[in-house]
């Protein structure tokens, strides 16, 4: 895992077209802005896990 230190207004670049910028820091909460192409999905981890779980569950609809 790469660990970086950034200040408000500073960014991290991933490849040529993804930018993550620190927008604010308040206590233990950090607000990030993500700029990425539309074809790149960006989710919070807990949302991604929920999406993944939903895809893995068998369909139980009536026939």
From Swiss-Prot:
Principal subcellular localisation of the protein: cytoplasm
Residues passing through the membrane, by range: none
GO cellular component: cytosol
Stretch forming the signal peptide: none
GO molecular-function terms, A-Z: mRNA 5'-UTR binding
Gene3D superfamilies: Translational regulator CsrA
Location of this chain's protein in the cell: Cytoplasm
Protein's UniProt keywords contain Cell division: no
The keyword RNA-binding is annotated on this UniProt entry: yes
Subunit structure: Homodimer; the beta-strands of each monomer intercalate to form a hydrophobic core, while the alpha-helices form wings that extend away from the core.
Function: A key translational regulator that binds mRNA to regulate translation initiation and/or mRNA stability. Mediates global changes in gene expression, shifting from rapid growth to stress survival by linking envelope stress, the stringent response and the catabolite repression systems. Usually binds in the 5'-UTR; binding at or near the Shine-Dalgarno sequence prevents ribosome-binding, repressing translation, binding elsewhere in the 5'-UTR can activate translation and/or stabilize the mRNA. Its function is antagonized by small RNA(s).
Similarity section: Belongs to the CsrA/RsmA family.
Record protein name field: Translational regulator CsrA
Classification lineage: Bacteria, Pseudomonadati, Pseudomonadota, Gammaproteobacteria, Pasteurellales
């Amino acid at each position: 895992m790469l660990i970086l230190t950034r200040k408000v207004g500073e960014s991290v670049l991933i490849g040529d077209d993804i930018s993550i910028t620190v927008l604010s820091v308040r206590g233990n909460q950090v607000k990030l802005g993500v700029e990425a192409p539309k074809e790149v999905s960006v989710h919070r981890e807990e949302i991604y896990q929920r999406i993944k779980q939903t895809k893995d569950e068998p369909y139980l609809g009536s026939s």
